[in-house]
Amino acid sequence: MFRYIEKEARDSITAALEKLGIKVPPEIKLEEPPNPQLGDLASTVSFELAGKLRRAPIEITADIMSVIETPEIFETIESKGPYINFFVDYGRFSSRLLESIQDDYGSHPPRDERVILEHTSANPNGPLHIGHIRNAIIGDSLARILRMAGYDVETQYYVNDMGRQIAMIVWGLLNLDGDLEDYPGDKMDHRVGKLYFEVNQRLKENPGIRDEVDELIRKYEAGENEELFRKVVEYCLSGMEETMKRLHVHHDRFVWEGQFVRDGTVDRVIESLRKTGYTGENDVLYLDLEEFGLEKELVLTRSDGTSLYSTRDIAYHLQKSEEGDVIIDVLGSDHKLAAEQVGIAVELLGGKRPEVIFYEFITLPEGSMSTRRGVFISVDELMDEAHSRALHEVKKRRDLPDDVADDIAESIGNGAIRYYIARLSPEKHIVFRWDDALSFERGCASIQYAHARACKLLEKASFTGEEDIEDGWKPEGDERELVRLLARFPVVVEESALARRVHPVAQYAQDLANTFNSFYRSTPVIGSDFEGARLRLVDSVRKTLRNALNLLGIHAPETM
């Protein structure tokens, strides 16, 4: 509906310019005035025409205003200096908007574009930790937004089964007493992490172990010990997938790094790069990128001839280039150089350079799970802590059966983590503060509470969805602001998808929840003269909040 009123405004200006014999510019720009008293939309078309017509913008606006016709969706069109301001007829517009809001509100028609979005892709050498969580949340939320915007999206997890870390774990299984089941931990990824830590300690004591690990890597590339390597990786991934499922993070496909060595793709990549004329060789084969503005070369092989992560990454991106129209990677800001190097190499071989979303890191304040004898904080621990803190808040507020309180706490705890991370642009560093994350006055809990409050009000009113919108209903104040916000939701989805950003959806959800809570306190619904219209408005807010939270991977509870 917001795009509809934009179209009506542009069409009215176009018709006016044609009447005046003025050539219509390629784009008639519209903006939302900062003050609603200045209208719902404003056009700066007179500024755009001033140079070509050699006239003052205010004179051009006066001419346009003398012939412009007001579309029925607008109450009036006024000039404010050189601006042309459009005021929506909220009596007419609000009814149309509420009639249009269905369960899938915010969804866009399918686009003929396939997106391959890789995210998380943590090495399977232990549990996911706080350093991985922002990647997973940005990637999963963006995939949801892109799908709602009409894109065909496949999310991928790139499994590093050929890295040194996995070879170290395999060395541990071959040389230390016991199997993975013998290590402490409730989940397999934690047991793998314990073994990896132990091997690291042995390596510090005996650096000669490194040669044995290198030999394992060579043998694995040649096809030996495949079963053991796969066992280690699958064990660890099973635990990591449990964590991601609890956090509502989903991957459509797991792509194993080793496949590109096994099927000869890496060899073909190396041979193709040699033919570009940009490679050099000393102890290792490398790609000279100085001509592309990078002083640091990209090393393609080890001195013993085995492939490196970078080479296999190029092979993987070439596969993604064949499978998708748009390639998106989510990476930490410390990967900027490597991503630039791989992007150049992929383009040299005719592939698509990926769009990369870089993010800064997340930390916990000192004393808040941040230092546990120097060991990283796992995502499992973070979620357990969030659940525990949320359960405490829930029990303070209501006397509920344990199982109900537990479910609500899980919803609030996971929502707190996902929302707190999604709400900021990826370029900003995050310090995770529990009091802010779990606040019922701000943050995700307040949004979930607004949804639950809407559900309760509709239940109390025995709402059916068939209620009539009364004649004469013309929203004002918070009611009107709710209508304005509801109309914008599809635009927020579209713009977030195009910008490849998640935080505008998070901010929108907070704005909608805040406005609804204000409306709830100030505006009577049940028993009012406009009960039908207001119940329909509340139901539209419920649907939109639910859909916005779903885009962020957050459950919208019906009770809190």
Swiss-Prot record:
Cellular component GO terms, alphabetical: cytoplasm
PANTHER family reported for this sequence: ARGININE--TRNA LIGASE, CYTOPLASMIC, ARGINYL-TRNA SYNTHETASE
Organism: Methanothermobacter thermautotrophicus (strain ATCC 29096 / DSM 1053 / JCM 10044 / NBRC 100330 / Delta H) (Methanobacterium thermoautotrophicum)
Catalytic activity: tRNA(Arg) + L-arginine + ATP = L-arginyl-tRNA(Arg) + AMP + diphosphate
Protein name from the UniProt record: Arginine--tRNA ligase
Mitochondrion found in the keyword field: no
Pfam family, one: tRNA-synt_1d
Domain of life: Archaea
